[in-house]
Every structure is written in C-alpha cells, then in structure tokens.
Amino acid sequence: MLTQNELKYYSALLQKKYRQQEQKFIVEGKRLVEEALKSNYKCEVVIMSEFYAKKDHSTVEKFSKHLRTEIITEDNFKKIAETKAPQGIAAVVSIPSSPIKISKDEKLI
C-alpha cells in the first residue's frame, strides 16, 4: 500500500525540477508501461487505479509477479497522473545515467 508520503513524492515527479533532481519519471498507460519495462530502464513501482485493476486482472498478475505493484483509489491516481483522463496504470521509472563520451579528436570548449 502506498503511504501518503510516497503519494506526495510521486506526484512531485510531475514537475520537471523534481524529475531531474530524483532522476525518475512517470509513464502512463499500459503500452508505455510495457515499453518502459522492455527497455533498460529500471522500474521502481507500477501503480494502478482500483477500477483498472478490477477491469484488467491479467495485467495486475503479470506485473505483480516481478515488480512492486500498488493499487490505489481513483482520486489518488489522479494526483500522480498528468493526463486529464488517465487510463489507470502508471509506472515510476529511473532515468538511466549515460556518461558523456568525448572522442580524442574532439575538443571541449
């Protein structure tokens, strides 16, 4: 179960400042969540609304086997969603750090 502090933390990620500071972002929608999980991004948690969880049991089972999965109320889900009509599923994903590569021939000014 998500605590109120976690809910506030995830809703803060809607602001660019906090996404950059925490090196995390939220993806919304089943397709985007699945794409993020297929990539090399590290998923912290998958969050679903109660309505979505009741509607799509197979997705709940699929994600809960391998990841922390939380089911929250519709009102709480709207706090972490950026869209006006959220689908009911989102994931908190870490931004991978990529070192800057400079070839020996290039110069930094």
What are the roles of these predicted feature ranges?
Residues 58-64, 100-103:
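Short loop/helix-cap segments at secondary-structure boundaries that form the rim of catalytic
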Residues 33, 54, 78, 97-99:
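Glycine-rich nucleotide phosphate-binding loop and flanking beta-alpha elements
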Residues 24, 44-46, 68-70, 87-91, ...:
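Structural motif
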Residues 10, 28, 72, 93-96:
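Short gly/ser/thr-rich secondary-structure transition/capping motifs
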Residues 61-94:
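Glycine/small-residue-rich loop that forms an oxyanion/phosphate-binding "nest" at active or ligand-binding sites
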